[in-house]
From Swiss-Prot:
The keyword Nucleotide-binding applies. This is Phosphoribulokinase, chloroplastic. Component of a complex that contains two dimers of PRK, two tetramers of GAPDH and CP12. Disulfide bonds join C47-C86. It catalyses: D-ribulose 5-phosphate + ATP = D-ribulose 1,5-bisphosphate + ADP + H(+). GO terms for molecular function: ATP binding; enzyme binding; phosphoribulokinase activity; protein homodimerization activity. Keywords: ATP-binding, Calvin cycle, Chloroplast, Disulfide bond, Kinase, Nucleotide-binding, Photosynthesis, Plastid, Transferase, Transit peptide. Its EC number is 2.7.1.19. Residues 1-31 form a transit peptide. Its main location: plastid. The gene is PRKA. It holds the Pfam family PRK. PROSITE patterns: PHOSPHORIBULOKINASE.
Length: 375
């Protein structure tokens, strides 16, 4: 095991960050016990939102399913505690309408933000809504479905933070930030292997979407509370996106959660955990933790580069993490083993999606005034 640690710099910002985090752990947020907690998840298409939702709903229990008796092409998933709404349902233009107007599905003029705001607000207030359905098969907007107000509402899609009215309704914001290289590798794998698309058609699709992605989707990440950033590995040359370097970027100063840390809060840590307690074949594993800035805001960053060989050995890494919001020792490892068939289970995407899911639970419990004991 290789380990290097740099103690916090002797400056007010490092010490005040640690002190503030400790003080917040005793904070109880006053809120209406019956109010729906609303979570926003932003990302481009094909960036792992569906897998993340499956991991998160698994933490709360129950199997997500479409609304009972509804449209078989519904995008909504309902489980015991959560309802997940796909914001594609608020397209105001169907596929042909976008083609006629010459706009992509990412363009603001293709969204009904007024309806999105009114319905998310109503659900947060405990009311039911009749929500439209965007049919991804036909490209049409289908008849609406009735959605009841759940304990936890997740709105996921391209624009959850774009409209300021909607953003102000959110109790917690998450962004999946996938680098262009990885996104391209994933899209080739999915669309060529699973959908029979040609390489040229994939390149053309990516090129057509990129201007709107850069203008309307990517800027939302500066407003997120937590960001899962997926980058190419730095361990070995890899142009196929087989190995990933994943960073969990956590804003400091939140009243809703305490950032996770490795070994020592506020320090800068570089750790190679491979050895007797963690099997590491090619290309190995390297972890990092330390302070940084994100669009001018102070953040803590936890990073994993490489992949696990044996998920049950993840307990060794978990034992060195603090403020994970786990209810008991080994809960992260248990969740990872439970969902081992999900994409990303052997690398940092699965690990950090699981941790963020636990943070969502912490946010919910703080708002409804339940006791949370940090681990």
């Amino acid at each position: 095991m290789a380990f290097t640690m740099r103690a916090p710099a002797p400056r007010a910002t490092a010490q005040s960050r640690v002190t503030a985090n400790r003080a917040r752990r005793s904070l109880v947020v006053r809120a209406d016990k019956d109010k729906t907690v609303v979570i926003g998840l932003a990302a481009d298409s094909g960036c792992g939102k569906s897998t993340f939702m499956r991991r998160m709903t698994s933490i709360f229990g129950g199997v997500p399913k479409p609304p009972a008796g509804g449209n078989p092409d519904s995008n909504t998933l309902i489980s015991d505690m959560t309802t997940v709404i796909c914001l594609d349902d608020y397209h105001c233009l169907d596929r042909n309408g976008r083609k006629v107007k010459g706009v992509t599905a990412l363009a603001p003029e293709a969204q009904n933000f007024d309806l999105m705001y009114n319905q998310v607000k109503a659900l947060k207030e405990g009311k039911s809504v009749d929500k439209p359905i965007y049919n991804h098969v036909s490209g049409l907007i289908d008849a609406p479905e009735k959605i009841e107000s759940p304990p936890i509402l997740v709105i996921e899609g391209l624009h959850p933070f774009y409209d300021k009215r909607v953003a102000e309704l959110l109790d917690f914001k998450i962004y999946l930030d996938i680098s262009d290289d990885i996104k391209f590798a994933w899209k080739i794998q999915r669309d060529m292997a699973e959908r029979g698309h040609s390489l040229e058609s994939i390149k053309s699709s990516i090129a057509a979407r990129k201007p709107d992605f850069d203008a309307y989707i990517d800027p939302q990440k500066k407003d997120a509370d937590m960001i899962i950033q997926v980058l190419p590995t730095q361990l070995v040359p890899d142009d196929k996106g087989q190995y990933l370097r994943v960073r969990l970027i956590m804003k400091e100063g939140s009243k809703m959660f305490d950032p996770v840390y490795l070994f020592d809060e506020g320090s800068t840590i570089s750790w190679i955990p491979c050895g007797r307690k963690l099997t590491c074949s090619f290309p190995g594993i390297k972890m990092f933790y330390g302070p940084d800035t994100w669009y001018g805001q102070e953040v803590s960053v936890l990073e994993m580069d490489g992949q696990f060989d044996k998920l049950e050995e993840l307990i060794y890494v978990e034992s060195h993490l603090s403020n994970t919001s786990a209810k008991f020792y080994g809960e992260i490892t248990q969740q990872m083993l439970k969902n081992s068939g999900f994409p990303g289970s052997n690398n940092g995407t699965g690990l950090f999606q699981t941790i963020v899911g636990l943070k969502v639970r912490e946010v919910y419990e703080r708002i409804v005034k339940k006791d949370v004991v940090p681990v």
